[in-house]
Amino acid sequence: RLSFRFRFNPLDKRALNSIALDAQMEGIPLWDRDISRYIYSNRVPVFNPLEDFLYRLPGWDGKDRIRELAATVPCRNPYWTDLFHRWFLNMVSHWRGYDKKYANSVSPLLVGAQGTRKSTFCRSIMPPSERSYYTDSIDFSRKKDAELYLNRFALINIDEFDQVSSTQQG
């Protein structure tokens, strides 16, 4: 009733407890298990925040903003903008779950001196409202944590790639 939230938040034990306490404070008689039973049923639709973001975007106006973004990177490779465009479309396709059979096996690799805004460019790929699905800190030496990050984040900037050992590269 009064405690309804309009913004997506990841659900954890703390959030479940808050839902139960808020409902009880509003006079709704229930048990903790009632909340879990409802939340983990088909009555609550699966929510994908990136899909929701993409769905709310206006229709495409025909302007190629991806190649325009790629062109902001100083690069002598004549294929850079086309390759970045292909990678970007594949990334979004994977966000939407269109291609679960194949992984995106291509990743842009930005090479340059310290302080040339490589990480800033990577961060700018994600819109501000979706930046919680971006990270630039991943530790490949801890396999379990790395696998969790690969599932949790939509875009991972592997900063200092030259320091990742060949066994950790895959």
Where are these regions (language model features)?
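Conserved AAA+/SF3 P-loop NTPase catalytic/coupling segment centered on the Walker-B
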Residues: A154-G170
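Generic structural signal for alpha-helix starts
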Residues: W31, P127-P128, S165
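P-loop NTPase catalytic core of nucleic-acid-dependent motor ATPases
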Residues: Y38-R152
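Intein modules and their embedded homing endonuclease domains
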Residues: R1-W60
